[in-house]
């Protein structure tokens, strides 16, 4: 991470921060406003979801957008910084088209296979191994999503506390690891212990609106932050000198002789391999496709495909704008979690503080929602024939939350979560399993048909993603 100097900054930046420190004194009113705004939107969403099984086209588009959108949007600028604008756009188009095509395969397979449950399609196609493959992939994806949400708490909550409390002198409540544990015990665990989701099931709508607000702020800040970033360059230069003096030279460090404010169109380095897994993680929504198909009013495969087309197009535009403006703002200095990068320029910014509070509220309330299906899967796998038990319910919940906390504490960055889950579980759910189900269950098309030959080659490049990541990791370890 790039550290900010203690009080010795460029005079323009200092004046700017002083102005924001003065404005920050009135921020509690704005903070209160954002929470009231969130509650109001949650009420609207509750009212909109009262009649299940009769979802309109527009509401289905909104629901699918909720399923697609997540923390993955925060890592897209980092992916663009390590691929370049042109290569990123090519990869984004490819992953979005392949993801949309796999939705087509999934809908067609569901009609032929006679089931609207992802795991049940796996069982009908390959028996218990197919069901286990689907269940494990969904569980891994949800654990990855939970971990990414808690990573956001780890990154952003100390910045919010510092904005209200003042300078960071090493207090325990400024440590992200302690804060993740505290938030998990005080807020997430009690909500996760609820037997039914209730109103928590609709916080995904609030989460989507928070991300839209975040995108607007990213675009706005692009025209407010100058380049070069004096504080960033100063601290990275000091860090580089310290590395050289200690004998450890970072071969991937930025060349400070080049123009760091000029965007690149093609970039190839050791981090480029993370781009496709990050994009895959950002587009995974396929386990939610079939339940939404079941709830669609006057449902047909063509109508649901139209819902998917509109949702994917909207998310494609949002992802492209967030990645592009985040990259153009920070260029090579962008971090794996975009929102955290702004703390390197702004010590106290009211708008960014509201964004952080909104995102923190959304992800904290979303963790119990994501944990719910994981706990259900574990219960079905281990104790399907047993009656409900509060003791078992509590033990499974605490175990899942504790393991996720350990991941967040010991995994170095959110980039590793995006990369690993995107290369494994997300790739399985988007590319490999829908193709395998289609080949096995759709009988009316022969194996030598153009459709099935194309589908058989469809997952092959993405199935090798974990091997590529392991190969790169081994190379880096060998160099070390």
Residue ranges and their predicted role:
Residues 426:
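Claisen-condensing/thiolase-fold acyl-transfer catalytic domains that form or cleave C-C bonds
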Residues 407-415, 419-421:
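Membrane-embedded helix-loop-helix hairpins and adjacent transmembrane boundary segments
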Residues 1-410, 429-480:
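Intrinsically disordered, low-complexity regions flanking or connecting the multi-pass transmembrane cores
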